[in-house]
Amino acid sequence: MVTKPARMYTRITGPAYTRKEFMGGVPYPKITTFVQGNQKRDFPIEMQLIAMESCQVRHTALEAARVSVNRRMTEAAGLDNFYLKVVPYPHHVLREHKMATGAGADRISSGMRAAFGRPVGTAARVYQNDVIMIGRTDEAHAHELKIALKKAAIKLPTPCKVVITKGKEIAGAIGV
């Protein structure tokens, strides 16, 4: 079965559906690593990727954004010169009522009778002004981190902004 477009699950409607003990066969989230880079070093510059609208972010979108930032920063700065943390966890279970299509589908399917749906994936509920990612680095790689976070924002279903939360005077002096 083909994956449905993410725009079907973007809006937040109704309460969160998270009680996995009552469901059978919830697929695991694709994102498994939430903290990357050098966790021990104290970096002078910190930037945050902040959601500007409320939405649900699928686990595949979170993973794509994480991979994007990680790849760009490891190529530019190496593993020891940055820190990355993905903040939201995809708790909300997404359901889909599979519909039969093609010739003779009306004889096989029961239409919208018992249309509750089966679990097909997970999503994180992100509200307006929530932090999605936190990135830290030094002065030499601050510009790369800002570009990496902007590229990650493209992969998410909400408009985002990059905010410098630590080291504004350093970042301003180097032109970030």
From Swiss-Prot:
One of its GO terms (biological process) is translation. InterPro entries: Ribosomal_uL16 (IPR047873), Ribosomal_uL16_arc (IPR022981), Ribosomal_uL16_CS_euk_arc (IPR018255), Ribosomal_uL16_dom (IPR016180), Ribosomal_uL16_euk_arch (IPR001197), Ribosomal_uL16_sf (IPR036920). Gene3D superfamilies: Ribosomal protein L10e/L16 (3.90.1170.10). The keyword Ribosomal protein applies. CDD domains: Ribosomal_L16_L10e. Keywords: Ribonucleoprotein, Ribosomal protein. GO terms for molecular function: structural constituent of ribosome. One of its GO terms (cellular component) is ribosome. Belongs to the universal ribosomal protein uL16 family. This is Large ribosomal subunit protein uL16. It comes from Thermoplasma volcanium (strain ATCC 51530 / DSM 4299 / JCM 9571 / NBRC 15438 / GSS1). The lineage of its organism: Archaea, Methanobacteriati, Thermoplasmatota, Thermoplasmata, Thermoplasmatales.
